[in-house]
A protein has these predicted regions:
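N-terminal Rossmann-like NAD(P)+-binding domain of SDR-like oxidoreductases, especially those catalyzing
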Residues: 1-172
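A general alpha-helical scaffold signature found inside nucleotide-binding enzyme cores
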Residues: 93-96, 185, 189
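Glycine/proline-rich active-site loop of Rossmann-fold NAD(P)-dependent oxidoreductases
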Residues: 147, 160, 172-188
């Protein structure tokens, strides 16, 4: 099986790629633009491509070449607090990039698309613990972008049969985390 991991130089992507390579015989293809991750984080054995996911034709060429079975989409610019001030950048990197991947996943009949969304889709209307039945009501552009991608995945399933899984992590930390960005990865700095 061939697995595509976006954000492969970041915390989640690199750790997942390492686990897959250590525990399965699957091949891992990784994409990252290195805006928040480091090449040192990419495990040996990953077929790595450095490019921007806003480039739809480049994604399509990669899908044609490698024919991945599963996509783990972990790439994002996760600066929730900064997102009201970088609206265009936020939507390009968190919404357009994601819809490009979804488009190629439909075209190439991907078996499953796993999307790292965010707890930010719930806004500040609720107190933890959160559950999936709560209404999403994001309050900033980052949460809006993540919510829009979730909705796009639901429609892609209904219209094209693209199977998907959505996870909504929040404030995770660990090995390979970028601790230098003051707008992201708060627990790593704390």
């Amino acid at each position: 099986m061939k697995i595509l991991v976006t954000g492969v130089a970041g915390l989640l992507g690199s750790r997942l790629a390492e686990w897959i390579l250590s525990n399965t015989d699957h091949k891992v293809i990784g994409i990252d633009d290195l805006s928040g991750g480091y090449t040192e984080n990419i495990p040996k054995g990953v077929k790595f491509y450095k490019f921007d996911l806003k480039n739809l034709s480049r994604i399509d060429k990669l899908f044609n070449k490698h024919k991945p079975d599963i996509v783990y989409h972990f790439a994002a610019y996760a600066a929730e607090g900064l997102s009201p001030f970088i609206r265009k950048y936020n939507y390009e990197n968190n919404l357009i990039s994601s819809t490009n991947l979804i488009t190629c996943s439909i075209k190439h009949d991907i078996k499953r698309f796993v999307f790292a969304s965010s707890m930010s889709v719930y806004g500040n209307k609720y107190e933890p613990p959160f559950h999936e039945d709560l209404q999403q009501c994001p309050i900033d552009p980052y949460g809006v972008a993540k919510f829009a991608v979730e909705q796009d995945l639901k429609i892609a399933y209904e219209q094209h049969g693209l199977k998907y899984t959505i996870v909504r992590p929040h404030n995770f930390y660990g090995q390979n985390q970028n601790i230098w960005d003051k707008y992201r990865n708060v627990l790593g700095i704390w």
